[in-house]
Amino acid sequence: MININEYLINKQTKSIHKVKPQLRAELLEIIKTKIEEEGPNCNLNFIDTSDIEDMQSLFENSEFNGDISQWNVSKVRNMTDMFSGSKFNGDISKWNVSNVKIMRGMFHRSAFTGKYGDISNWNVSNVENMDSMFANCAFPLKCSLKNWETSSCKNMRNMFRQTTCGSDFDISGWDVKKVETANSMFFNSIIDCDLSNWKLDSLVEADSMFEKANSFTFDVSKWNMPNLFTAENMFADSGITFKDIRHWDISNMLGVRNMFKGCEIKCNLSKWKFSYKLSDRSKNSMFDQCRIPEYCLPNEIKPLRMEN
């Protein structure tokens, strides 16, 4: 176990020898000591982090905005809430994050924008959980994330919730075939990106996925979501126009309330079949405030509309 005084001794002797913590708790103590001495803009590159596997909440709700650009994070597997609620907006573009499995809430509510170090070339191919990763970011993202390899990710819930992304932002080519959960992924976000070629074969939960995200204009006609189970408010108040979704299979879905609220549908869905477990009320609410010709409604709904 590292002696916390090692850093203090090195400072007094002006040694350039790096401190090498083995555990997250030791790393936290060193960071705390340095920030107390030199303030939140201090340089922490004197810390050798090559043995650290867990960086969860390392700078959560911190004023830190110093230099950690040279950190070796090659063994880190967990970066949950690492910068959540923090003021950090430094350069971490050259980090090797290839072994990280969890990035849940990593930049949630933070000041990070990627302006001073684009993280678009990060190797995130092993990350399985990106839940709330950029949710509620304080400032618009300045990085594109275009080159991210997301083929291992299963959870993208709240990922860009209430986030504004810059003009360079482009996730159109992301591999999302393993994503199972995308609830509120783009809820109330400001993102203009074409997701028409996304393959969502594994998607199970998509409640509020695009709710109030009214900057999207892409066509979902190519989408196929055979495993979709719940999609309440999925496109509610997004303003998306649906040109042709006749081929969508909704027969296994049990959550459809307000799915197309405030949208426009320009295709005939009369042959759609609902799950026998769905109540009439749920079926009917699927198209609440939706602009769709009466004859285009699913046949199972038409009698319900007439009753009302």
Give residue spans per PLM region.
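Negatively charged
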Residues: M1-N308
